[in-house]
């Protein structure tokens, strides 16, 4: 469960290491984001020669949360940390690699590219 001011790890090779959520997209009263939701983030920690710089603002999709996601069969998939993948204005991933597992909930038309790049889909 991600809200404004939440810090997330970055699960791609854009050069960003940590981002902070500045807005949950999808309605003016929307407070929380879960796996598969798009958020607006700012880069807080970046690698020296990365594609992105500290202070820049991007869209991102949440790929892992410590809160987890409940499946239809009653199982719960959760992770040790919160992570996101940075997106451009067209909601396409900026990076060319994804690190760590992602969930099946991302298998929508919008995020199939992320699922195909991920090393493991849970």
Curated annotation (Swiss-Prot):
Keywords: Ribonucleoprotein, Ribosomal protein, RNA-binding, rRNA-binding. The keyword Transmembrane helix does not apply. InterPro entries: Ribosomal_uL14, Ribosomal_uL14_bac-type, Ribosomal_uL14_CS, Ribosomal_uL14_sf. Pfam families: Ribosomal_L14. One of its GO terms (biological process) is translation. GO terms for molecular function: large ribosomal subunit rRNA binding; structural constituent of ribosome. GO terms for cellular component: cytosolic large ribosomal subunit. Binds to 23S rRNA. Forms part of two intersubunit bridges in the 70S ribosome. Part of the 50S ribosomal subunit. Forms a cluster with proteins L3 and L19. In the 70S ribosome, L14 and L19 interact and together make contacts with the 16S rRNA in bridges B5 and B8. Belongs to the universal ribosomal protein uL14 family. PANTHER family: 50S/60S RIBOSOMAL PROTEIN L14/L23, LARGE RIBOSOMAL SUBUNIT PROTEIN UL14M. This is Large ribosomal subunit protein uL14. The lineage of its organism: Bacteria, Pseudomonadati, Pseudomonadota, Betaproteobacteria, Burkholderiales.
């Amino acid at each position: 469960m991600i809200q404004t001011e939440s810090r997330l790890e970055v699960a791609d090779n854009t050069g960003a290491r940590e981002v902070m959520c500045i807005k949950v997209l999808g309605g003016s009263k929307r407070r929380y984001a879960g796996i598969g939701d798009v958020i607006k983030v700012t880069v807080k920690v970046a690698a020296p020669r990365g594609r992105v710089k500290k202070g820049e603002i991007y869209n991102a999709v949440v790929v892992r949360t410590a809160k987890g996601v409940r499946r239809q069969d009653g199982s719960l998939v959760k992770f040790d940390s919160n992570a996101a993948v940075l997106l451009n204005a067209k909601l396409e991933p900026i990076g060319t690699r994804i690190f760590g597992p992602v969930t099946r909930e991302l298998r929508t038309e919008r995020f199939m590219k992320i699922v195909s790049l991920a090393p493991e889909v849970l």
